[in-house]
Amino acid sequence: MINKEFDQDLRYHGYRLMAVDGSQIHVPTNPNDQDSFVNWRENERPHNEFHLNAMYDILQKNYTDAIVQKYRTQNEDKALIEMIERSPVSDALVICDRGYESYNNMAHLQTSGWKYIIRVKEPGGRGIADGLQLPECEEFDFPVDLSITRRKNKETIERLKNSNQCRYIPNKVKFDYLSKEYKRGDPTELFTLNFRIVRIKISEGSYEMMVTNLPKEDFQKEELKELYSMRWGIETSFLNLKYIVGMLGFHSRKSDSVMQEIYANLIMHNMTQFISNCVQLHAKENKYDYTIRFSVAATIVKSLFLGDISPLNAEILIRRNVSPVRPNRSYSRKPRAKAQIQFTYRIA
């Protein structure tokens, strides 16, 4: 309801840009909750863990949907499909990382009318690319019309000889659009996926491979590279959610209460972003474009909700705290020492 009220319907070439990803959440230890209890994992002590699956509007910078699962029952593919099916958006472009590489996910996206960009494993990684005959060059943009079947009979055996034309998948592989049981003489079921598999150079000696159903005439390789890089917004939002909004500082151990706190923090993140989006930044001729500093905005929005400052003062303060946008920067991740967070300094 809140999302609908603040929806600006921002689009890229007519598409709503959505990123889907998951993130682990360490919650207060509760050995009685066996579904979330991690008894042992290398270099880790026993703890409880939830998994947040989120759909994120890249242009508006807010979460449009979320599904929270427990450690032992987590299933990112199932969560993705559920979020697609209940989304009111009919013309979206969803961008996913390699964790969502599967024919079943591609089929659900194609059937829903959504476009997608999904990063896939390189040949040899036991992924989609392994079963295809791809060009022997460093970069390529290769169209594929692939029929999926669970049957091996006279009708399919000849087609299966061409791995770019037909693919057999056994019953143990999940694919919701083909029956697992059939009788002799039943017509052969086929489901055709239409996509491009693209390999792009991202830096010296580094390449990314992805599948997409975007039309080639409208979206060339370089544009796909730029679009995929925009997926990083959801990674940044997870950091904001955990360490600025304060999602990791739980008050309760009970699963239902922990779940409630997670959704409360998602709402707080969205409200901070919605209010920030309403603040108009003054146009200046500077070297960089500027964006509102989320860390400061979250504190200001909290004070606004508590009645400590007026809406006008909140707008002025948010407008004053901006950061330059410096694109194409990357740094290696360096682990740092971590201290506890005092309750006084948490946002929520």
State what each model feature region is.
Residues 38:
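Extracytosolic and intramembrane catalytic regions of membrane-associated proteins
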